[in-house]
A protein has these predicted regions:
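A glycine-biased structural micro-motif
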Residues: 104-107, 184-200
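Short, surface-exposed helix-loop/turn micro-motifs enriched in polar/charged residues
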Residues: 30-34, 195, 214-218
Length: 231
């Protein structure tokens, strides 16, 4: 049986030395590198938090259906989202390649409302044809699943146009919030320098004014919160 009176701390001399040796050896073999990745950020504590410190709260919420205009066309696609305030960071709209509703749109561009950024319509098997409208907005800077899709296509913006690339180093997510979860300079007026929930309210009001909000419907959501701050 296990003797619980005996234990080792990962920063003990022996353990620490072994970890450093392993990392150095892996680095020499080009098996390990230091890079960027999306993290859980607590705007109250102003620190990244472990996945183990994130708790999910189930609640009733809303799903908003938003019209995204197609470039050089009178048509649009409708994107369903629970977080319309993040649309300023959108870098693509993805559809399932087997979805007959959108096959003719793959490769075309969306002109993102309020921003004017041109974002591509991509085909990806990740998209669930049965959820929402079957059109998924891709916001790599603010969603873990979107981050993986953005990395897969190396999405990056060049002069107001989001492009894809075969080079992983080209991938550059667009971050729209600062450490306090207020909108930053990547968000245009009158939506910048606002708390994220005030951004949501302002976005929805403007979408209604421009007749870009198709509808809203009740939707059960799972909200991640920091275990220590409940934010």
């Amino acid at each position: 049986s296990v003797d619980w009176n005996k234990y080792r701390f990962t920063l003990d001399d022996g353990c620490n030395e072994a970890v450093i040796k392993a990392f150095v050896e892996l680095h020499r073999k080009n098996k390990i590198y230091r890079g960027y990745r999306l993290v859980n950020w607590d705007p109250s504590l102003k620190t990244a938090v472990s996945d183990l410190e994130v708790v999910r709260q189930e609640k009733d919420g809303l799903l908003w259906h938003i019209k995204y205009p197609i470039e050089d066309s009178e048509d649009h696609v409708i994107v369903a989202t629970t977080r319309p305030e993040t649309m300023f960071g959108d870098m693509a709209v993805a559809v399932n390649p087997n979805d007959d509703r959108y096959k003719n749109l793959i490769g075309k561009n969306i002109v993102l409302p309020f921003v004017g950024r041109k974002i591509p319509i991509l085909a990806d098997d990740y998209v669930d044809m049965e959820f929402g409208t079957g059109c998924l907005k891709i916001t790599p800077g603010h969603d873990f699943n979107d981050y993986e899709i953005g990395k897969k296509y190396s999405l990056h913006e060049v002069n107001g146009q989001v492009e894809t690339s075969d080079s992983a180093s080209d991938f550059k997510p667009i971050n729209i919030f600062n450490e306090d979860a207020w909108s930053n300079k990547n968000v245009p007026e009158p939506f910048s320098n606002l708390d994220r929930f005030k951004v949501r309210k302002a976005v929805l009001e403007k979408l209604k004014e421009l007749n870009l909000l198709e509808k809203e419907e009740k939707h059960h959501i799972s909200v991640p919160r920091g275990e220590r701050s409940n934010i």
